[in-house]
A protein has these predicted regions:
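Catalytic cores of glycan-processing enzymes that make or break glycosidic bonds
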Residues: 1-254
Length: 254
């Protein structure tokens, strides 16, 4: 049903085709659960059939804990992988060049479950998480702030290394805020990915800071109710956004 009106379908947590962690009501916590396995070969066969019937591409959100061999199995059925820039790091902590992403994948900078680019860079998500009581103590929060600072520097180093920022652009994140130059450079950078598909968040083009969803919350935050900062008729006429999309189109064609 979901494929009938779209050319592509993204399956959230595609590992559910293989297994799900079930927690009985009687368990004291999530640790009292167990994996329940599903007939993945049958489900993949049905998925492939419906994909052909509806002429829809399938993207599998294969993040988190991924059992060995599953990505290869999904690839055999032409299910596209999902590569998020923030998660694509090497053993030394540096960011993998989007040019090295798998071809059979959809590349993206961030997702609906992550902060916007401005929110990430300014650590708005960490402060909001503190307000919502998402962290067990201040020590955990301090560690997250330190990790974020290091990640930002690695991102900036990578952007300079790929020459997507002006040569005279700041090279230290110590006092560097997120501006339009940096924002759009990150989007152009991931647009150069070797992956066949690209997904970008409209709120990043609009330079919005508030997230649309915060995992682990329900009534604490108005998930999925945040509106875009500009109506369709307005942002489609924005010269900077039009130039950004034009630059992205050129990079996707190369």
């Amino acid at each position: 049903a979901n494929m009938q009106h779209a050319g592509a379908l993204r399956i959230d947590h595609v590992m559910a085709l293989l297994r799900l962690w079930w927690v009985p009501k009687t368990a004291e916590n999530a640790g009292g659960g167990a994996y329940v396995y599903y007939p993945i070969m049958d489900l993949l066969g049905i998925l492939a059939l419906e994909s052909q019937r509806n002429q829809a591409v399938i993207i599998g959100e294969d993040l988190g804990t991924v059992p060995d061999g599953i990505r290869e199995l999904l690839a055999q059925y032409n299910v596209y992988s999902y590569r998020v820039f923030f998660f694509e790091t090497a053993e030394d902590g540096g960011y993998i060049s989007p040019a090295h992403y798998p071809v059979q994948a959809m590349a993206t900078l961030t997702t609906h479950d992550l902060p916007t680019l401005i929110g990430f860079w300014h650590c708005d998500d960490l402060r909001l998480g503190r307000e919502l009581g998402l962290y067990k103590d201040d020590a955990q929060l301090h560690q997250l702030f330190a990790q974020r600072h290091a990640n930002k520097q690695r991102i900036l180093d990578s952007l300079h290394g790929h020459h997507v920022l002006p040569q005279d652009f700041e090279r230290s994140v110590q006092h560097l805020g997120m501006d339009k130059t940096l924002n759009y450079a990150m989007q152009r950078h991931v647009a150069s990915a070797s992956s066949q598909l690209l997904c970008l968040q409209l709120e990043d083009a609009l330079q919005m800071s508030q997230p649309v969803n915060i995992p682990g919350t329900s009534t604490e935050y108005p998930n999925w109710r945040r509106k875009l900062s500009q109506p369709l008729e307005q942002w489609t006429q924005d010269a900077d956004i039009k130039q950004l999309f034009s630059d992205i189109s050129v990079r996707r064609q190369n």
